[in-house]
């Protein structure tokens, strides 16, 4: 007797912000005995080579933005070619449902699925719906959200909205078990700095100069872990060596970032959806610097959710100066009780079972066909 095993097709662009929640959902679906396939773009190899999918389909994509009409037209043509490939692959895979995680690379496979009448679920990680998801929302059966309140959902999108939270990687769930590390007046102060999956030049420019401005006694207690873009690594390391900072670890990427978050007293970072959700789940206070150039200011909206409950301080990039950061670090480390309260506030906003919640939504939506 042949046993039918349903397949769910996950569609996510090849950056960590989209792939990490898709990876978490894949683990949750596979635990239910469901086969998982992944449709993505060519960047995936550098981010998630061990994605738990039975097969990975690479579909050409592009982002139709920028000022050049020729580049926009070229992007539309690329998306059109991707649509043709996606439609062919969907007929072959025959998924019971398709889940899109946002970003223009998901448009060809999700749109093809909608036209082929495959149930589609959109997961919006940010507090503002991205343009790709907004374009696809009208044809979705269900819209799952990472934040309780999401702006920018089109009026014509009639699908039910379900707040699942953002699915978390197993390493984040494990890190969330670690209590906030208490510290006394003479203890080491552990600061983690990172700029998201693609790094952030501003962190390499501002943070070293802020550290140089700290009081000597405070700087001597500092244990700093900082993600630095490869092209900036030597300059940043030399700057810290010049100021005699011993407890410093700088690298372009940390595979064990969740564990490093859990070991930290304070985090300085961008405010992508995955970062904000992981900070909440692990329960760590943060100084968040939203990416200023995002089309819909989604990172500013994400940061505002933690700022509003006292779990983080949101600082606009023009205000993120060495002087401002040095002052904030000095104030934070001078008041351990305030940091502990911020950690508790962050943890109160965390959703640890988001992957299971989203898996349930996917299974229920697929079953309604």
Swiss-Prot record:
The keyword Cell cycle applies. The gene is murG. One of its GO terms (cellular component) is plasma membrane. This is UDP-N-acetylglucosamine--N-acetylmuramyl-(pentapeptide) pyrophosphoryl-undecaprenol N-acetylglucosamine transferase. InterPro entries: GlcNAc_MurG (IPR006009), Glyco_trans_28_C (IPR007235), GlycoTrans_28_N (IPR004276). It is an enzyme of class 2 (transferase). It is a peripheral membrane protein. One of its GO terms (biological process) is cell division. Its EC number is 2.4.1.227. GO terms for molecular function: UDP-N-acetyl-D-glucosamine:N-acetylmuramoyl-L-alanyl-D-glutamyl-meso-2,6-diaminopimelyl-D-alanyl-D-alanine-diphosphoundecaprenol 4-beta-N-acetylglucosaminlytransferase activity; undecaprenyldiphospho-muramoylpentapeptide beta-N-acetylglucosaminyltransferase activity. HAMAP family: MurG.
């Amino acid at each position: 007797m042949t046993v039918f095993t349903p397949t769910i097709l996950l569609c996510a662009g090849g950056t960590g912000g989209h792939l990490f929640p898709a990876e978490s959902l894949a683990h949750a679906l596979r635990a239910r005995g469901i086969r998982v396939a992944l449709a993505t773009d060519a960047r995936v190899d550098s981010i998630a080579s061990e994605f738990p999918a039975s097969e990975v389909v690479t579909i050409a994509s592009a982002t139709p933005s920028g000022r050049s009409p020729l580049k926009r037209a070229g992007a539309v043509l690329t998306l059109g070619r991707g649509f043709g490939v996606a439609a062919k692959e969907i007929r072959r895979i025959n998924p019971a449902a398709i889940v899109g995680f946002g970003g223009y690379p998901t448009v060809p496979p999700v749109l093809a699925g909608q036209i082929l009448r495959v149930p589609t679920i959109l997961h919006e990680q940010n507090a503002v719906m991205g343009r790709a998801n907004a374009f696809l929302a009208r044809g979705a059966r269900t819209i799952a959200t990472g934040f309780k309140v999401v702006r920018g959902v089109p009026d014509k999108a009639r699908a039910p909205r379900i707040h699942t939270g953002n699915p978390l990687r197993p390493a984040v769930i494990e890190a969330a078990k670690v209590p906030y590390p208490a510290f006394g007046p003479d203890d080491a102060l552990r600061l983690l700095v990172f700029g998201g999956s693609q790094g952030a030049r501003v962190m390499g420019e501002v943070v070293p100069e802020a550290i140089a401005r700290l009081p000597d006694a405070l700087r001597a207690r500092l244990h700093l872990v900082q993600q630095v873009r490869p092209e900036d690594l030597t300059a940043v390391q030399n700057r810290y060596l010049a100021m005699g900072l011993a407890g410093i670890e700088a690298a372009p990427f940390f595979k064990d970032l969740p564990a490093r978050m859990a070991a930290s007293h304070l985090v300085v970072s961008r405010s992508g959806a995955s970062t904000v959700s992981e900070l909440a789940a692990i329960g760590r206070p943060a100084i968040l610097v939203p990416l200023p150039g995002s089309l819909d200011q989604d990172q500013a909206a994400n940061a505002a959710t933690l700022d509003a409950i006292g779990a983080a301080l949101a600082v606009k990039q023009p205000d993120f100066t060495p002087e401002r950061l040095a002052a904030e670090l000095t104030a934070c480390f001078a008041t351990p009780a305030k940091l502990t309260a911020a950690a508790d506030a962050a943890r109160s906003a965390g959703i640890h079972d988001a992957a299971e919640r989203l898996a349930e939504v996917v299974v229920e939506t697929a079953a309604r066909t």
